[in-house]
Amino acid sequence: MATERRFLNQAKEKTMPVETRRIALLNGVDVIRLTGTIEAVKADPQVACFKFRIQNRWSGCGQNRSQVQQFSAGGRETQHKTNLTLEADEPDVLLGTDKGANPVEHLLHALASCVTTSMVYHAAARGIAIEEVESSLEGDLDLRGFLGLAPSVRKGYQQ
């Protein structure tokens, strides 16, 4: 946590305890911390380097459970405030038990979340208020690629 503060509370905010630091929220984003992060990255590009990782365990049929705990931020190991768990399964038509989103649905969620968060943070950095963001994503799959039945058919999403 202290390591994380080093990267996110640069400049004049660096010496202020988090509890007494002013917070200016725009789109739910702490703009003071965001500005400090931007300045820290400008001053030291190494601060921008992150490595995220998960530990996955197959639990039968199409079910998987991944644990998210630690990551590297600016070359230093840090961890989430709590251990996070991601569950995946396949729908019945793909021989699963349908107890969770399947891996390709998780990919769509990750893409939508990444694009939306990026847009909201960039807007906040520019002083633009956003009232609402909604998106719909879809992807086409052809099981012949996954099953190895047609070498010309791409495995995974088609585009």
Regions found by a protein language model. Name each.
Residues L111-V115:
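Alpha-helical metal-binding/catalytic segments enriched in His/Glu/Asp
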Residues A2-H109, M119-Q159:
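Extended beta-strand/beta-hairpin segments
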